[in-house]
Amino acid sequence: MVRAAEALVPEARPLRWTVDLARPVPIGRVDVRAEVVRSGRRTSLVAAELIADGRSCFSARILMVVPVADAPPATAGVPETREGVPFQFPFFPWPEGFHTAVEARRIAGEPGCGDLAVWLRLRVALVDGEVATPSQRVAALTDAGSGVGWGLDTQVWTFLNADLDQHILRAPRGEWLGLHARTRRAADGVGLARTEVFDADGVIGDAQQGLVLARVVTA
């Protein structure tokens, strides 16, 4: 989605993307349809849809902004210097998937407590033969926020994110992206994951995901 938006408005960079997820994306061929639905001097809005097997898996609206040189000084970030220890997502039932496409290092918190910080790095190309842009890497990795900050027994409960709403202050520097995710739950099967996104130089943005919580169905 972000890749398509960058191609349509190459002079701009993503500031915000809002994604609504309709169904899981299968492993296989997918197609992305995108168009500029609003264009202005500094901002443009791109609508995009991901199609697999003839069905829409999710849709997105990406707000693009044109950067300028005549701008006030940037606010100082707080450097993130912790290295972390190797970490694996323990709840994926498949031999291959997101958990094998990334390298992860835990830097704060305990897994499963609902408050965890990790470093993530892509192991694979998002598109064969292409080097992902910084914004594309952010889009690919921050969807993991709900999985980083999970706080339930995954043998008993599932937590599916129904959306992703993200703002990015600036592009990350370096290949490692940090996520500090916290999850809160209501008593009616609804949750909210809030994620601070950072690199070694400090905070670069934040993300929110609405969660649909349900008991694991056993045969």
Predicted features, each with a name:
Residues 1-219:
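Terminal targeting signals and extreme-terminal segments of soluble enzymes
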